[in-house]
Amino acid sequence: MGGFERRGVRQYNRSEVPRMRWTEEMHRQFVEAVECLGGQDEATPKRILQLMGVKGVSISHIKSHLQMYRSGSSNSNHPVSLQKLTSATVNNISKREFVNSEDRCIYASGDRNTASSDKNTYTILRCGRSSMPSIEEIFRNWEQTRGRLLPWNSNVITTEQATTRASRQTTNYSKPLKQLTDCDLTLSIGQLWDDAAGSDADGSSTISEEVAAPSRDEAFVSSADDHFAAAAAKKESNMLTTDLNLDLTISSSWLS
């Protein structure tokens, strides 16, 4: 037994005497014997067994039945019936049952006097690996205990919903890319730019410069010429910019 004992678990030693099913008649005889002996506090199992005189009933059966009878009638002045005594016994046995944490998943409250809104905070979750609760169940339990009016999953996005949204966005982005393949764009530039580009493209334009050491007067004239040349170049650039024409041709298949 030492290998199967668990720390913190109270061992329950069952009696070797076989169980016996109490009938209404046997319980009535038991109650009459208890009353004849002066009540439940004065009656002893041995005297009760002698007064009952029922075959197949041992003193161990009388002891256990008397203990349950005392616990059931402690809060009542009237004799307890067999039905109430049986239900009370079942409740006591169910409280002592050990629930295997590997096979079942239960929520057991540690304090019964706490408010209903705070029970979930002090709830002890004992769950096996094969029955792990989902995030939806945890949020549903949390919302229901606090009486929220909003749906429990109003702000929760599951994995399936996130996957669906991502696929929809990918489809929406891919459609414009497919449609743009049928779009034809034509850029036409003014005559001044065409002439300049054509001369550079065929390599026919050449630039020859002769550099000489300028004198003082020539340097002054050269700086003035550079100033007027820069102003003229800026004005010419503005004129070229205004001469830029952009023609956009879109095929009819893309518009449809």
From Swiss-Prot:
SUPFAM superfamilies: Homeodomain-like. Pfam families: Myb_DNA-binding (PF00249). It is found in: Nucleus. Its main location: nucleus. The keyword Transcription applies. Residues 45-70 bind DNA. Keywords: DNA-binding, Nucleus, Stress response, Transcription, Transcription regulation. Residues 14-74 form the HTH myb-type domain. It comes from the Eukaryota. One of its GO terms (molecular function) is DNA-binding transcription factor activity. Plants overexpressing MPH1 exhibit increased plant height due to increased length of internodes. Plants overexpressing MPH1 exhibit increased grain yield. Plant silencing MPH1 exhibit decreased plant height due to decreased length of internodes. Plants silencing MPH1 exhibit decreased grain yield. Probable transcription factor involved in the regulation of plant height by elongating internode cell length. Involved in the positive regulation of grain yield. May be involved in the regulation of genes related to cell elongation and cell wall synthesis, which are associated with plant height and yield phenotypes. Plays a role in tolerance to cadmium stress. This is Myb family transcription factor MPH1. It comes from Oryza sativa subsp. japonica (Rice). The gene is MPH1.
